[in-house]
């Protein structure tokens, strides 16, 4: 029997697919929709210290090759999501979950993580170090000194399972430098990648979204090659205890297969989930299993990370 089961840290999942933070995760109702689908798990909307309305609309647009957005981290506040996943966990009848959070300053991040540390929540936390769409706030993970200081500080008090959502890197030296930092800490996972920041899509001489004069994060087909490169680069550089979640350009079983081939333990779907809805998880799972059967693979471990190079 072909299995797409996988593991992140000590958490086991019966499938390798889930939503990406930002899609089908703003409200409890949306999260329950994902929970009831064939997704292995869900990740919440990135929760900040306070409720945020986000950037002015229109702030999202589908395009021929994917999407562009400048959402600006709209969310109901981290407490809303923390209380929800904590309540689900208490029932003992739900999948393991991911709680996505970030502060708009180091102090806010510390306040949020200490609150989670003091709570009953024992699931995974995804610390978002890569949102490109908050005006005046740079992507943290592009500043290696700040990233190192942040991780060094948080692991002095935070002992629950935690991973980080990364922006795309484009330079081999940056892969080396980032991995050297991440390998110093007990991270459960890294998520590669968030949208490619500050793209521009034009239609009939006009930009598609309002914030930042049309500049926004690019998702979908545009970013799959970059996402695959980041997944594989970190798979080759990170210690085995740090799992990799692949995100970017996944809309078919073949896309998911390629992320796993590059080293991903789980795969998140964003733009295509927004376009198709939670039924996408059933379709992509079937397509992935069909590929595995055709190639004689029984489990993800049979091919994870086994990308072949040209002689």
Swiss-Prot record:
Pathway: Pyrimidine metabolism; UMP biosynthesis via de novo pathway. The keyword Flavoprotein applies. Its cofactor is FMN. The lineage of its organism: Bacteria, Bacillati, Bacillota, Bacilli, Lactobacillales. NCBIfam families: PRK02506.1. CDD domains: DHOD_1A_like. FMN binds at residues 45-46, 128, 165, 193, 220, 248-249, 270-271. Catalyzes the conversion of dihydroorotate to orotate with fumarate as the electron acceptor. GO terms for cellular component: cytoplasm. It comes from Streptococcus pyogenes serotype M5 (strain Manfredo). One of its GO terms (biological process) is 'de novo' UMP biosynthetic process. This is Putative dihydroorotate dehydrogenase A (fumarate). SUPFAM superfamilies: FMN-linked oxidoreductases. Binds 1 FMN per subunit. Belongs to the dihydroorotate dehydrogenase family. Type 1 subfamily. Keywords: Cytoplasm, Flavoprotein, FMN, Oxidoreductase, Pyrimidine biosynthesis. Its EC number is 1.3.98.1. One of its GO terms (molecular function) is dihydroorotate dehydrogenase (fumarate) activity. InterPro entries: Aldolase_TIM, DHO_dehydrogenase, DHOD_1A, Dihydroorotate_DH_1, Dihydroorotate_DH_1_2, Dihydroorotate_DH_cat, Dihydroorotate_DH_CS.
């Amino acid at each position: 029997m072909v299995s797409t089961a996988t593991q992140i840290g000590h958490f086991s999942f019966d499938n390798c697919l889930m939503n990406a933070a930002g899609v089908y995760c703003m409200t409890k109702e949306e999260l329950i929709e994902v929970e009831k689908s064939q997704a292995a798990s869900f990740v919440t909307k990135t929760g900040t210290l306070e409720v945020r309305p986000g950037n002015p609309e229109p702030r999202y647009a589908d395009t021929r090759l994917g999407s562009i957005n400048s959402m600006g981290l709209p969310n109901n506040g981290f407490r809303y999501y923390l209380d929800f996943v904590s309540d689900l966990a208490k029932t003992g009848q739900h999948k393991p979950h991911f709680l996505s959070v970030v502060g708009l300053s180091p102090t806010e991040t510390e306040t949020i993580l200490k609150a989670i540390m003091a709570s009953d929540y024992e699931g995974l936390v995804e610390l978002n170090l890569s949102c490109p769409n908050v005006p005046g706030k740079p992507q943290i993970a592009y500043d290696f000194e700040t990233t190192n200081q942040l991780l060094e500080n948080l692991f002095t008090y935070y002992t629950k399972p935690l991973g980080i959502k990364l922006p795309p890197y484009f330079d081999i030296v940056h892969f080396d430098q980032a991995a050297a930092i991440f390998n110093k800490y007990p991270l459960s996972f890294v998520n590669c990648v968030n949208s490619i920041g500050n793209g521009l899509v034009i239609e009939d001489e006009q930009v598609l979204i309002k914030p930042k004069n049309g500049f926004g994060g690019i998702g979908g087909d545009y970013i799959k090659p970059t996402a695959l490169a980041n997944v594989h680069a970190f798979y080759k550089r990170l210690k085995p205890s740090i799992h990799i979640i692949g995100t970017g350009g996944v809309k078919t079983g073949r896309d998911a297969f390629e992320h796993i081939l590059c080293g991903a333990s789980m795969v998140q779907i964003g733009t295509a989930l927004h376009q198709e809805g939670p039924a996408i998880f059933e379709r992509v799972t079937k397509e992935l299993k069909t590929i595995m059967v055709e190639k004689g693979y029984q489990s993800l471990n049979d091919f994870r990370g086994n990308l072949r190079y040209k002689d």
